Amino acid sequence: MAAVGSGGYARNDAGEKLPSVMAGVPARRGQSSPPPAPPICLRRRTRLSTASEETVQNRVSLEKVLGITAQNSSGLTCDPGTGHVAYLAGCVVVILDPKENKQQHIFNTARKSLSALAFSPDGKYIVTGENGHRPAVRIWDVEEKNQVAEMLGHKYGVACVAFSPNMKHIVSMGYQHDMVLNVWDWKKDIVVASNKVSCRVIALSFSEDSSYFVTVGNRHVRFWFLEVSTETKVTSTVPLVGRSGILGELHNNIFCGVACGRGRMAGSTFCVSYSGLLCQFNEKRVLEKWINLKVSLSSCLCVSQELIFCGCTDGIVRIFQAHSLHYLANLPKPHYLGVDVAQGLEPSFLFHRKAEAVYPDTVALTFDPIHQWLSCVYKDHSIYIWDVKDINRVGKVWSELFHSSYVWNVEVYPEFEDQRACLPSGSFLTCSSDNTIRFWNLDSSPDSHWQKNIFSNTLLKVVYVENDIQHLQDMSHFPDRGSENGTPMDVKAGVRVMQVSPDGQHLASGDRSGNLRIHELHFMDELVKVEAHDAEVLCLEYSKPETGLTLLASASRDRLIHVLNVEKNYNLEQTLDDHSSSITAIKFAGNRDIQMISCGADKSIYFRSAQQGSDGLHFVRTHHVAEKTTLYDMDIDITQKYVAVACQDRNVRVYNTVNGKQKKCYKGSQGDEGSLLKVHVDPSGTFLATSCSDKSISVIDFYSGECIAKMFGHSEIITSMKFTYDCHHLITVSGDSCVFIWHLGPEITNCMKQHLLEIDHRQQQQHTNDKKRSGHPRQDTYVSTPSEIHSLSPGEQTEDDLEEECEPEEMLKTPSKDSLDPDPRCLLTNGKLPLWAKRLLGDDDVADGLAFHAKRSYQPHGRWAERAGQEPLKTILDAQDLDCYFTPMKPESLENSILDSLEPQSLASLLSESESPQEAGRGHPSFLPQQKESSEASELILYSLEAEVTVTGTDSQYCRKEVEAGPGDQQGDSYLRVSSDSPKDQSPPEDSGESEADLECSFAAIHSPAPPPDPAPRFATSLPHFPGCAGPTEDELSLPEGPSVPSSSLPQTPEQEKFLRHHFETLTESPCRALGDVEASEAEDHFFNPRLSISTQFLSSLQKASRFTHTFPPRATQCLVKSPEVKLMDRGGSQPRAGTGYASPDRTHVLAAGKAEETLEAWRPPPPCLTSLASCVPASSVLPTDRNLPTPTSAPTPGLAQGVHAPSTCSYMEATASSRARISRSISLGDSEGPIVATLAQPLRRPSSVGELASLGQELQAITTATTPSLDSEGQEPALRSWGNHEARANLRLTLSSACDGLLQPPVDTQPGVTVPAVSFPAPSPVEESALRLHGSAFRPSLPAPESPGLPAHPSNPQLPEARPGIPGGTASLLEPTSGALGLLQGSPARWSEPWVPVEALPPSPLELSRVGNILHRLQTTFQEALDLYRVLVSSGQVDTGQQQARTELVSTFLWIHSQLEAECLVGTSVAPAQALPSPGPPSPPTLYPLASPDLQALLEHYSELLVQAVRRKARGH
């Protein structure tokens, strides 16, 4: 054991600072002095002096053991002189005095689990055997509790040991692989005789005269004679002489127990077999008698001078006469499995028999000849001591019921002064793999509410989860069913974790299957059961009552965190998936404001703050710490200010909960092996206890890191630890099924109590100061507004300054700022480029970059602190800015006559409303299960085609606000502002900070003619200003879009980035998002996953959406773009709909080709780079919430979107925030060669369905036809996005670099005098539509406008020739037009077109736009009426002849309209006239254009046919 290092335990005076982090751990750069100590109010004046190692080991003593690990009679023995019973419990020998109910303990200093023990005949010594490699046979002094002798002679474990009656010899038998049988002269520590036994030996027994001993096992009964072996006067080891018993026809039996006769039966030997046979051998080793016990299985045997006791299954112990083998009686059975011990208040309760009850098997027996007591150990790890003086009146002397399998968690019941307590003071709870939760209390004083039961003096109550008793019996007892060394078998069942609510009324527990249960503690009834996770629940945590909220967070091995609201009957509030691996601990912190901290096996710690929105509470990530080691557990001190984390490298790291900074790092284990598994801070915050995988426990000073005490005794890893609230005990539980209660020394207890008094005194002073300052108004709430969730910047007052001021209240509040600075979009690891890297780059004199402006948002420092992406697309949610920059100058006729009367009547929205009437109020289909919540700031491209605006903010939260028509925006239009970076040849100087205003105008070049290159290019710093609109605010012009970055933190040049790529392999990129809340799933989901847990629905929400998308036909919406900004419009009210936004999985850079030129008349559809993405939004990609998002603009005006919600579509296997911190990509700064470069970086995936392959083929037809040889810019290969559907395993990889670049070229209207008509595509079928919606990169054709009689035909309808090189431009509009938008397009000259369309100038049409709008409005209304009529006819149960005829006519009309549309869209393609069909069916997907490869075309056509057939079969099945 490592000695305690120098340095002393006593602290210095109040002026002492916390020492810097230990050697080997780099201190944070920029710190000129070590971090200060915690406030003086948290210092402990009572000090413990430096102590020796012996004192350290003796400061904590083992008071009580609740558990037993005896597997057979070899693990149970009795002192023949005193009647004390000794049994095994891990690495401890428990010596029990049944009369006094007191325990003594002998510790195995080797820390190996004990396998066998036996008392010496005089009761002064105990011999033990061990498990493991090179086990020892040890002799212990019972009185002194120390080791007398140690004998090494085995290799693989000791199965059984015994003293000879004359105490000269000790016999030890090894396990089967050891095969060694040794006879020891234990006083001389030598082996007298030895031999090898090839079969497995289970038990042995000495004869009364010590002349021989008998071993039994598999087909084995052998007599070993000591006198013949030891008569030879040879000092060396001699062979042990043995003779086999003559078994006769019983030679194939497995014998599990043996006992040599006593008294007049001294010459006989009794054996029992597993098959239930009791055998008697005479002095000549001949089988003399045998009887059938009439049981299915027997396991153990014990004899006295007069009686024989045989332990059998089902709690049976049969009693026979020793001299005649006559059956006398049975012992009373113990409790039945599943008994409610709390009801056993009367002794007669034990003898009540329950019909069809199952009783535990008997596994070990020992007899006390002094008191005539028989001790029995049962298979469920219970112990009974029976008084058998009169076998006709057997009485119970003592009993105890222990856990029979892994004990996973322990919780101490909180203390209450009033009558609210459901349990007596000092109670604690344990849970185990035996599927029970047990309530214990060590207080011997009687309690009126909890009377002591007859089964146990310490066990108050047992909760059998779901009344499951199949795991109560330990399956590792019998050698033919379990492990030989007696290690408990992990059956992957039972309760894994639990937590008591702060009010003491509820108990939350999570099992190993992922279920979450809530029990109320008055009557132990199960209130709630939630199928929460897909894997075992690893941690549960209730929020602190000081926060004003009652939340329950559950985290699991499935890497998800579910936050439940207790006050709302445990409804789900949020699901977080920041972690990329198992979550090992989760804690709530904060007194007035609430924080959530979690750590996991992905080496990440996430600090989150709560934000209250209109739709509930949401946690937003504020800090992310990425360590280099796995984090196994953590705990928070009483001040809620520090969190201690147990790390795999055996260190305890202490972090500040406010800013996430590491404050301390010290050793958590005194050994040199293993990992820290658990950490727990005592109730006073003075000490912390740690457990290591070497099975040791340490008590450490929380502030100095000095080891105060260290203990051992468990034979398996310690799974949980808790200090009691009275500061007297530490309770530990382990995988060895034992619960250890450790008594803390008086010096430790006094320190803890003194510290609590100091804290209480400080709180009283603070309360007095608060009353004095009560005149000052102060907002007191448990959460802060979204705009106040900010990290402290280096220029602001730090937490260390707050410590020096000793203001705990202000210190524990979430820091807030008056300004509306945006949060950093990506939270990266700390530190900067190392010095050696700077020297190689020649940046030795680079400024440290710490002198930021105090108003800048927090920027992490470090060599990985690179912005994951460039400036993202961003929204303006301020009314003045919206009116100023985006409100179009509408013609009076259009504004007055048409637009005011238009209503949003798209087909998809109508169908979605009719399909989900219960969701009509919220405006999204019922099958959309869960909105993806994320607690991070990310960069997204979002396109809103309807009333709901979906974008991302930089405030680390996604929100949604319904768009309402305001005074200046009567159409309820949705707006989007686009920010972008400049291309390589127009990038600003490196030292110039890019403001938001600088980046806004750069996007105009996509829509305006490209001017000649500027010799000194810079972005325009002024925004367009229209008459009647307020100009841009000063905040808007000065606010940076992202955090200001020091020049030494980011690669500023291509050379720097190449250097980073070379030395660091990858660069940090933006983290991914999370899915959202779940709703009840439908019956169809049982086909995919019968167990529909919250996590399952969370991860499969996009799969469900993709399965149902084909039932919703495409919408007809069109967006208009006004240069230089992007305006997304929706003609309609404020009711939000799903399927209107798309969240880019990674990031998108849109680089401007030139400066903006304002033209008020330059209205045109958006460029293909936007419409292609906006058109392919899946129906489930937008799920509305009601949260508010702060914006970096002034106060928003009601009626406009104040917040947006941007759920993304992450699959289960995609990178999370923590994984992206280590596996990342970067966009090379020197790879852009064209005037326009767009990078759509998406993770690799497989196609999610066969229909997706079909849609991909149609996309490729349009894309490959549009590519031109002149596009030579280097584009990245786009990767296909995964929606979590694993049905299709095909891997289709296509290189579309030139196509993607071509899509972002300026439209052809950049060439003066060139205008071409827009090209339309045929409407996709519902099957095709569903396939198209699956793609994040799909290019969906637009729906054409139906030809109406009032609309004159176009003069010409040219054919579509092949692609012509050299024609710049983009692809056709890929958005589905609304009626108003079509009227605008057809009433004004088209300004852009496809690159392959011949260049022809077309005269404008004289048609009035208002007339077009009226026609389209009537068309929509009529079609809707026809559709409603058809739906009624189809849904009616009884169909007469008239209804059938009407149905047929409607179908025929619909098909005729469809064929006419196809004939008009597919120019030059002959379409057969529609034929009436008896029932509607989905039309076959039209072929757009021939593919370049015939093989690929055939493959895609084949997959398309398969998909159509599958959909039809599914439709017929429903």
Swiss-Prot record:
Effect listed in the UniProt record for changing R438H: In MCPH2; the mutant protein does not localize to the spindle pole during mitosis
Annotated GO CC locations: centriolar satellite; centriole; centrosome; cytosol; nucleus; spindle pole
Polar residues bias: start-end ranges: 781-790, 971-981, 1045-1054
Tissue specificity comment: Present in fetal brain, enriched within the ventricular and subventricular zone (at protein level). In the embryonic brain it is expressed in mitotic neural precursor cells.
Compartment list: Nucleus; Cytoplasm, Cytoskeleton, Spindle pole; Cytoplasm, Cytoskeleton, Microtubule organizing center, Centrosome; Cytoplasm, Cytoskeleton, Microtubule organizing center, Centrosome, Centriole
Pfam families per the UniProt record, alphabetical: WD40_MABP1-WDR62_1st, WD40_MABP1-WDR62_2nd, WDR62-MABP1_CC
GO BP terms in the entry: centriole replication; cerebral cortex development; mitotic spindle organization; neurogenesis; positive regulation of neuroblast proliferation; positive regulation of neuron migration; regulation of centrosome cycle; regulation of neuron differentiation
Biased composition regions of type Basic and acidic residues, renumbered to the chain: 762-772, 810-824
Residue spans of the WD repeats: 109-150, 153-194, 196-234, 291-330, 357-396, 402-450, 490-529, 532-574, 578-618, 626-665, 671-713, 714-752, 803-846, 1132-1173, 1255-1293
Positions of modified residues (N-acetylalanine): A2
Primary localisation category: nucleus
Modified-residue entries (Phosphothreonine), positions: T46, T50, T1053, T1268
InterPro entries, sorted: Quinoprotein_ADH-like_sf (IPR011047), WD40/YVTN_repeat-like_dom_sf (IPR015943), WD40_MABP1-WDR62_1st (IPR056161), WD40_MABP1-WDR62_2nd (IPR056162), WD40_repeat_dom_sf (IPR036322), WD40_rpt (IPR001680), WDR62 (IPR052779), WDR62-MABP1_CC (IPR056364)
Region (Disordered): 762-824, 908-935, 962-1055, 1339-1377
In-chain residues carrying the UniProt-annotated modification Phosphoserine: S33, S49, S52, S501, S944, S1070, S1093, S1101, S1123, S1144, S1228, S1248, S1249
SUBUNIT field: Can form homodimers (via C-terminus). Interacts (via C-terminus) with MAPKBP1 (via C-terminus). Interacts with CDK5RAP2, CEP152, CEP63 and KIAA0753. CEP63, CDK5RAP2, CEP152, WDR62 are proposed to form a stepwise assembled complex at the centrosome forming a ring near parental centrioles.
Protein role: Required for cerebral cortical development. Plays a role in neuronal proliferation and migration. Plays a role in mother-centriole-dependent centriole duplication; the function also seems to involve CEP152, CDK5RAP2 and CEP63 through a stepwise assembled complex at the centrosome that recruits CDK2 required for centriole duplication.
The protein's name in its UniProt record: WD repeat-containing protein 62
Organism: Homo sapiens
